[in-house]
């Protein structure tokens, strides 16, 4: 392993001395006023016979580039809706290995006889399909004005949320969500809160990667969702603000502000958001305990639980980019997130005999107050050597999480005549800290004959310290509960290196990659525990893995493209899931960690066909070994909810994604995914074999009218599915919105109704360990929301999509408090 790691590191260092042979033609497209023209079509022709070589489009800054162009003489044409076509002078590109930058191509507006009857719009499509990712261009949809990041995600193809706000991509959980290439370090509930406070106006693109390249951390069996925020390079001061008032059963106001200032060589930005969130969660659970024959009912457990949650969250991010030269940038970013959650739970449990006669009643009021304080510091460096694309980047990160949870549980038992039979009171005090240190560097270099090299290394160190102090309260005197009090220490080090090589043939693009990751970790449990936990134990583990990736893209013609990709990935358990503590929900239901969790490994294969940027058809297959997910283990009368390895998961499916402008004012976007999922393995001494064929439908209708009016009708529906031991019933939701631009299109108002028919209520059941259980959920999901968004200062130009963090996989593995309402 050491030799391999040294070899890959040496490759990174040696690459800096390789000569460049990048045949490249670059330039810009602007209008008569010198303003950049985005999404202009630029075509390269051979001068000799006027045959077309290649076509591309300009970015937000009007830039375009043609890579790996053979020596010769060429012509360029540039066009855009609302402009006449312009041609370049002849281009002599006979110097091998040179990069030729042509003078700006200036588009002049044509003469239009009746402008009142004609409106020209040149923009990117809402959804773009690339060989290795799906790109959501947020600004391409006018109805995204006044929306949040979560709103855009929920209508993105293949993205769904479960009852706990866990994000899935194409039916698979454990997706890594990143902001500007940086994992969020947040629990599903905290992440959902943050995404709802992040305005869509601050987002440039959302990238959906089901099979990321070797450049990315190998973690995340279902891939990566990367949210790229806008970053203004225009001199002066500008910003945006977003204010939302949502009303369901409880009010959910939120607000955010994004500020940017550039003067000279320094660029400053400040982003903040606050949401005093309130909500509810109604949970009904019925368990039928069966005899050994698996049919005869022995007893029945019926529980109705109401949870009220108040969860004010605050996030802040400040950064500086200093442009040492036109090629070199230094950056500093500091960010923080504070989440103070308070849950008040009322649980009423009926214990029944097989004939449904009442045996006893247990009433369990409880409170849980949890505070999370997350902070992160990042230093970053970027140097572009030349226009050919040679680049070096580096990141240093430190992240710290502090949490404190105080719990109170009161269990009162009554007879059917409501005579009090007993009472037990338990309190808990659970402090915890997580420290993450990472360093990474990436190097990109175009080579001769159409090759491109990417390579890099990453080091990460993590340590966690979690304690659980529980006390039994008898006659108002607290006694230490030694069977539950515990402390858990965890250490982890991951060393990684990767190399990617890309080759462009005439119609075929090939990218091959290999990532090596060496993982070393240890855990030490002090004190006492139950179930899978020993009284005092420790473990040390180490393993080395190789993660190959391969991408093949073949362009049949201007309208048809074929892609095939393969990748191997890993998912490591969240740090808290390795912690053997018990978290009490009520007298009969616990949550627990599992120090024996093993990482899971996934093989992904995808093949797709894209037609005219309109229809994309994809076939996929994945196989996961040592798959871990939420499991349920019955121990006497107690149901223990913990993450466990359940064996294997297989998934095969076909998806169709299409977008089409039905009229000049109506665009429809359809996504459908039909997939088969099977879970099989040995779990808690019993064979598990469960499967289902599921259909996911997502339809989004966008309307753009005159005078700044717009609208949207969207919805999704998912048929019966499976998730580990649980069979999921069908569910979906329908939403609608209307928008109006005001203040000369610098601001907008949006009125939205979410979950109109209140159908987003996931239900499920499981049949395992001689137990039949049904679970029904209801949350505060039907909402009416009014949003005001305002962009002030100079218009956003020159977006720099580069994120500032190297702490990728490590951040996504932090789980924290959150009710998921």
Question: Could you describe each region identified by the protein language model?
Answer:
Residues 41-45, 79-81, 97-142, 162-164, ...:
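Short, acidic, small-residue-rich periplasmic hinge/interaction motif at the N-terminus
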Residues 47-63:
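Short, acidic Ser/Thr/Gly-rich low-complexity loop/linker segments typical of extracellular
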Residues 93, 183-210:
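Short acidic/polar hinge/loop motifs at secondary-structure boundaries
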Residues 104-106, 149-152, 191-193, 208, ...:
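N-terminal periplasmic accessory domains that precede
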Residues 218-225, 233-284, 310-315:
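Outer-membrane beta-barrel translocator/receptor signature
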Residues 427-428, 436-440, 481-486, 598, ...:
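Outer membrane beta-barrel strand-and-loop segments of large Gram-negative receptors
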Residues 486-494, 541, 570-618, 623, ...:
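Outer-membrane beta-barrel signature, preferentially recognizing the C-terminal barrel domain
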Residues 520-522, 527, 558-604, 619-637, ...:
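Surface-exposed extracellular loop regions of Gram-negative outer-membrane beta-barrel proteins
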């Amino acid at each position: 392993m050491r030799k391999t790691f040294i070899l890959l590191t040496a490759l990174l260092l040696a690459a800096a001395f390789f000569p460049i042979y990048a045949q490249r033609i670059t330039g810009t497209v602007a209008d008569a006023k010198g303003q950049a023209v985005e999404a202009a079509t630029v075509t390269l022709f051979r001068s000799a016979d006027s045959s077309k070589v290649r076509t591309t489009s300009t970015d937000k800054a009007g830039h375009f580039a043609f890579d790996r162009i053979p020596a010769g003489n060429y012509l360029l044409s540039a066009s855009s809706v609302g402009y006449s076509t312009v041609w370049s002078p002849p281009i002599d590109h006979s110097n091998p290995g040179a990069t030729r930058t042509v003078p700006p191509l200036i588009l002049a507006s044509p003469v239009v006889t009746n402008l009142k009857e004609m409106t020209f719009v040149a923009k990117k499509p809402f959804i773009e399909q690339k060989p290795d990712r799906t790109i959501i261009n947020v600004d391409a949809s006018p109805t995204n004005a006044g929306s949040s990041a979560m709103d855009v995600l929920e209508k993105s193809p293949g993205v769904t949320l479960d009852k706990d706000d866990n994000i899935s991509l194409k039916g698979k959980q454990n997706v890594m969500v990143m902001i500007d290439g940086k994992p969020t370090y947040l629990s599903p509930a905290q992440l959902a809160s943050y995404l709802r406070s992040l305005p869509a106006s601050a987002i440039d693109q959302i990238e959906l990667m089901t099979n990321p390249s070797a450049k990315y951390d190998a973690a995340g069996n279902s891939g990566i969702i990367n949210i790229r925020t806008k970053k203004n390079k225009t001199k002066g001061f500008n910003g945006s603000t977003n204010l939302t008032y949502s009303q369901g059963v409880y009010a959910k106001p939120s607000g955010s502000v994004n500020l940017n200032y550039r003067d000279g060589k320094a660029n400053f930005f400040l982003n903040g958001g606050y949401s005093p969130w309130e909500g509810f969660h109604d949970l009904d659970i019925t368990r039928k305990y069966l005899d050994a024959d698996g049919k005869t009912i022995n007893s029945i457990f019926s529980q109705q639980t109401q949870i009220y949650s108040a969860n004010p969250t605050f996030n802040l991010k400040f950064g500086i980019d200093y442009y040492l030269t036109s090629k070199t940038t230094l950056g500093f970013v500091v960010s923080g997130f504070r989440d103070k959650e308070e849950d008040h739970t009322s649980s009423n449990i009926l214990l029944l005999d097989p004939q449904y006669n009442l045996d006893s009643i247990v009433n369990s009021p409880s409170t849980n107050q949890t505070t999370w304080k997350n902070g992160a510091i990042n230093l970053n460096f970027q140097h572009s050597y030349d226009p050919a694309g040679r680049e070096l980047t580096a990141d240093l990160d430190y992240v710290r999480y502090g949490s404190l949870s105080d719990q109170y549980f009161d269990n009162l038992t009554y007879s059917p005549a409501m005579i009090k039979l007993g009472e037990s009171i338990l309190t808990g005090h659970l402090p915890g800290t997580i420290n993450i240190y990472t360093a990474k560097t990436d190097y990109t270099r175009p080579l001769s004959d159409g090759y491109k090299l990417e390579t890099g290394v990453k080091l990460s160190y993590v340590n966690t310290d979690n304690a659980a102090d529980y006390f039994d309260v008898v006659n108002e005197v607290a006694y230490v509960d030694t069977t539950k009090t515990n402390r858990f220490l965890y250490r982890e080090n991951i060393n990684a290196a990767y190399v990617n090589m890309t080759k462009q043939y005439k119609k075929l693009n090939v990218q091959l990659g290999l990532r090596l990751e060496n993982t070393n970790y240890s855990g030490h449990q002090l004190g006492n525990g139950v179930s899978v936990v020993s009284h005092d134990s420790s473990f040390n583990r180490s393993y080395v893995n190789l993660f190959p990736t391969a991408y093949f893209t073949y362009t049949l013609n201007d309208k048809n493209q074929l892609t095939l990709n393969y990748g191997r990935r890993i998912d490591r358990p969240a740090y808290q899931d390795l912690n053997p503590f018990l978290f009490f929900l009520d007298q009969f239901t616990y949550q627990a960690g599992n120090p024996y969790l093993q990482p899971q490994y996934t093989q992904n294969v995808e093949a797709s066909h894209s037609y005219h940027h309109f229809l994309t058809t994809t076939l996929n297959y994945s196989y996961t070994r040592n798959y871990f997910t939420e499991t349920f283990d019955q121990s006497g009368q107690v149901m223990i909810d913990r993450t466990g390895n359940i064996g294997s998961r297989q998934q095969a499916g076909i998806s169709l994604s299409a977008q089409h402008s039905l009229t000049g004012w109506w665009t429809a976007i359809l996504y459908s995914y039909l997939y088969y999922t099977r879970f099989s393995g040995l779990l808690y001494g019993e064979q598990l074999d469960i499967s289902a064929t599921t259909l996911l439908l997502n339809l989004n209708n966008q309307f753009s009218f005159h005078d700044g009016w717009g609208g949207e009708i969207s919805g999704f529906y998912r048929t019966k599915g499976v998730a580990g031991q649980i069979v999921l019933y069908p569910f979906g939701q329908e939403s609608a919105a209307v928008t109006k631009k005001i203040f000369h299109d610098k601001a907008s108002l949006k009125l939205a109704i979410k979950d109109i028919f209140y159908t987003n209520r996931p239900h499920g059941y499981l049949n395992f360990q001689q137990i039949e259980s049904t679970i029904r959920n209801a949350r505060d999901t039907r909402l009416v929301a009014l949003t005001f968004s305002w962009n002030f200062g100079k218009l956003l130009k020159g977006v720099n999509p580069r994120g500032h963090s190297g702490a990728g996989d490590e951040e996504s593995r932090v789980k924290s408090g959150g009710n998921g309402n």
